[in-house]
Amino acid sequence: MTLNEIFNAKLTENGDLSFKKASDNPLLNILFLTEYYQKHLDEVPLLEDSDINRLFAMFIRDPRYGMGRRDLGRRLMSMTDVAIDDTIKAGRVDDVFYREYPDTYSFACVLDYLHSEIVKGNELVKKWMPRYSSKNLLLARTIAKYWGMNKQQYGHFIKCNTTENKLSDHRFDDIQFEHVPSLAMIKYAHAFSTKPETKERYLKYLEDVKAGKKDLKVSTTTVYDIYKNRDKIDADLFFSKIEKISGSWIPIVDTSGSMCDSNDSFGKALAIGHYLAKCSTYCPNKVVSFSSHPQLITLGQPVQRRGYWYYQQASKEALKKSQYQREIDSMYTGDCSNTDFGAVMRLLSHLDGNMPEYLVVLSDMEFDSGSNTSKEETMRLFKENGYNTKIIWWNLNSRNITVPEMDHYGNIYISGYNPMLLKYLAAGFDGEAFLNNLLREYAKAIGE
């Protein structure tokens, strides 16, 4: 180990060698640890006020072109002093109240800006303004007082024409489904499909979407959104409409017991692993699972390990489900006793010359003792044989800071649940190059 590695070494919950950080670059560390810092905001590293750090903060917050981490993004944008208009561009209007305090000049400037936007008819500003009926009652009173309005005047001024308001006002005929934002469409799909006033129109709309006659907005829909709501929506339709990226990779999903946590790490791993398997050019529809015994899973293929009776019952139940649900169910192995990543690496070391470009490891990184040694041996074997295969460490751990290796082999570090970011990978990239390209592409996307 290097001197830096020695002083940053630690053990996983299961006794394997790991580290406290991935790199000396704080942005790369945050990129890998967003799940943890989202739950531990008081531990977020301080970032100095610079253009690159401001752009990174916006990227972390942005649900359309970035990672969509609201609380962490707010903290970073406040820390790096992102401008008001850029704060709103990356997130929501109420993000500005996270950093501004009443009775200050900057707070007054924010309210003047928001007032002018509402006068212009900005519906999104209206939607995210604090309301008397919410937990932000005191803030709403402060704003109304500054604008010289009483409760009724303020409520009328910020009343918006969103899907939520149309539903609450029973203006069902005003809802144009092709204009409903992506997350609202998922949130209210059950209501649309069951309310007598909308059911017939909604089902006709879905048929039109399938026929290519109408659009379904999915700009901020993630694979995890589809996974969470797979029993409430037409998961096959939503999955078919999200952007697909292709890559030479093998998704490797951790199915150990520690993944079944309050952060739903297992659910996120399944959602991302399923997406990557569908998009893999190396082994389409294949996923490697690992716990005590690695398994190669074919999406949608029933698991027969529990005997004839279970197989027959599972097959009958599968007929009632969508293709998406069947493929997700096929990833449940029942093996959750260990986190033996070393067993996976030992098996993969026997691959012939036809190698994938990436091994995408979806895990909380709490590997069993000895896994690091097996990984080191396999990476050394890859290098000796001239293989350029790299590991994408996809961290889902919200409990601990656990890094499987420091930036030694040029591997990639990422977290969250947006696999679309992998489209910015390129041959020869290491973690730093990937991060830099993410920020370059994000700047283009938002017009910076």
Segment roles from a protein language model:
Residues M1-K268, K278-E448:
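Long lumenal/extracellular ectodomains of secretory and single-pass membrane proteins
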